[in-house]
Design a protein with these regions (language model features):
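Bacterial Sec-dependent N-terminal signal peptides
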Residues: 1-29
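Sequence-structural signature of mature extracellular/luminal beta-sheet repeat domains
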Residues: 24-359
Length: 359
C-alpha cells in the first residue's frame, strides 16, 4: 500500500515504466528483458532463459503465497474478496477457504482490506492465517471449506485488540513473529490510514508469540509501517520490510534479535522512484539471498544488502518458493491482479534435499 503520491505511481504509472539506464550490467543481448542482473554471482540461482508464467488472473488483491508440500499446491489469499485460493498443475485455480479473514469476530473498518493476508503452517500442518478483518492470528485445519471454524491464537496485546496482522513467520525454535500495521483501517480512496473508534493500539508493532504458553511480547514499535518479515539463515536477525507510505522511503531493515538494534540493510528510495511500487513481502532463499517485492517486481539482494537482480513481474505484493526452490512464485497487486511463477536454477546437488521455511 502507499501514500497517495507513491501508491498511485505504483498502481497507475507502473505499466508505462520502461527499463531505465540504472547502473547494472546486461550480460546478454538476447535474454528476457524481464530480468536485470546487477551482480553475476546471482546467476547461480537465476536462469536468464526462464519465462514468467501466469498461473492465475483476475485476483483482486493476491497475497500470502505459501507452498503446500502435502498437496503439491500453492495457497494464496485474495484480501479484497476475503478468501484463500489454491493452485496446482492438475486442477488450476480453485477456491479453498471462504471467508478467510473477516468473519465478524471483531469490529473493523468494513473496507476492502479485511481478508486474510499472510499464511503459514504450524508444526502439525494446520494453516495459520493473519486475519486483517478479524484482527487476530488464527489457525484452521488445512482443508477446503466454505464454513471455516478458526481457533484464535492471539488477538490482543496487553488487553488491547490488535490492528490488522499482516505477515507471520516461524523460527526454527518454534516462535512466531508477526507484523501488525493498521492496514485494516486504510481508506482506499485516499490510501491513508484513518483514525477509527475501533483502533485500540496507536502504533504499528512487530511481535513475538510463543504458541506453547501463549506469551506475546513486543519486539519493536520503532518501524513506522512494518510489513513483510523474514529470518536470516542463522536466525540471529529479523529482516523487516518497511513501507514508504509515510515518508516515501521504503527499506529493508535488519533487526538484531538479541540487542534489538535496527539497521538499514537496503534503502529502496532510488529504485522505487525509478520503477514505482512499494516494499511488501520478503523471503530468504537457501543461498542467503533475499527476494522481496519492490521496484515494480521482485528485487534480490544478498545478506550484505547489495542489489543482485530485479525481475519485472509488474507491481507485486509477495513471493514464495516451493519445497526444493525449483520455482519462484509471485503474487501481483491491485493493478496487476495475477499470480506468477518463474523457474529457478537448483542450488542442490543430486540426492540432496532441503527444508524450506514457509514464511
Amino acid at each position: 500500500m502507499k501514500r497517495l503520491s507513491l501508491l498511485l505511481l505504483s498502481i497507475c504509472v507502473l505499466s508505462f515504466v520502461l527499463i531505465s539506464n540504472h547502473s547494472c550490467k546486461k550480460l546478454s543481448s538476447d535474454y528476457s528483458s524481464d530480468i536485470r542482473i546487477y551482480d553475476e554471482s546471482i546467476l547461480s540461482i537465476i536462469d536468464l532463459n526462464s519465462k514468467i508464467e501466469v498461473l492465475a488472473d483476475s485476483i483482486s488483491l493476491p497475497e500470502g503465497p505459501l507452498w503446500d508440500e502435502k498437496s503439491n499446491s500453492l495457497l494464496f489469499t485474495d484480501i479484497i474478496n476475503n478468501k484463500v485460493l489454491k493452485w496446482n498443475e492438475k486442477e488450476g485455480v480453485s477456491d479453498y477457504i471462504y471467508p478467510s479473514g473477516n468473519t465478524g469476530y471483531a469490529p473493523n473498518s468494513g473496507e476492502a482490506l479485511v481478508g486474510a493476508n499472510a499464511l503459514n503452517f504450524d508444526s502439525n500442518g494446520n494453516l495459520i492465517l493473519c486475519q486483517m478483518g478479524d484482527r487476530r492470528v488464527s489457525i484452521i485445519k488445512n482443508s477446503s471449506t466454505n464454513n471455516p471454524v478458526f481457533e484464535t491464537l492471539v488477538d490482543n496485546y496487553q488487553g488491547k485488540r490488535l490492528n490488522s496482522p499482516n505477515d507471520i513467520i516461524i523460527s526454527k525454535d518454534g516462535f512466531y513473529y508477526f507484523s501488525d500495521p493498521a492496514f485494516g483501517f486504510l481508506n482506499l480512496d485516499t490510501f491513508q490510514i484513518v483514525d477509527s473508534e475501533y483502533r485500540e493500539i496507536d502504533f504499528h508493532g512487530i511481535y513475538k508469540f510463543n504458541p506453547k504458553n501463549k506469551d506475546l511480547s513486543l519486539v519493536t514499535n520503532e518501524v513506522s509501517v512494518p510489513n513483510g518479515l523474514a529470518l536470516s539463515l542463522d536466525q540471529k536477525y529479523l529482516y523487516i520490510k518497511k513501507m514508504g507510505v509515510f515518508d516515501e522511503s521504503p527499506k529493508v531493515l535488519k533487526l538484531n534479535l538479541e540487542t534489538k538494534k535496527i539497521n538499514t540493510l537496503f534503502d529502496g528510495r532510488k529504485i522505487s522512484e525509478e520503477y514505482g511500487g512499494d516494499f511488501d513481502g520478503i523471503k530468504v532463499h537457501s543461498s542467503g539471498n533475499i527476494f522481496f517485492s519492490g521496484g515494480g517486481g521482485i528485487l534480490i539482494i544478498n545478506s550484505d544488502g547489495k542489489l543482485m537482480a530485479r525481475i519485472n513481474f509488474g507491481n507485486a505484493t509477495n513471493c514464495a518458493f516451493d519445497k526444493d526452490e525449483k520455482y519462484l512464485y509471485v503474487t501481483g497487486h491491485l493493478d496487476n491482479p495475477k499470480v506468477y511463477r518463474m523457474k529457478l536454477k537448483s542450488s542442490l546437488k543430486i540426492g540432496e534435499s532441503i527444508k524450506i521455511d514457509t514464511h
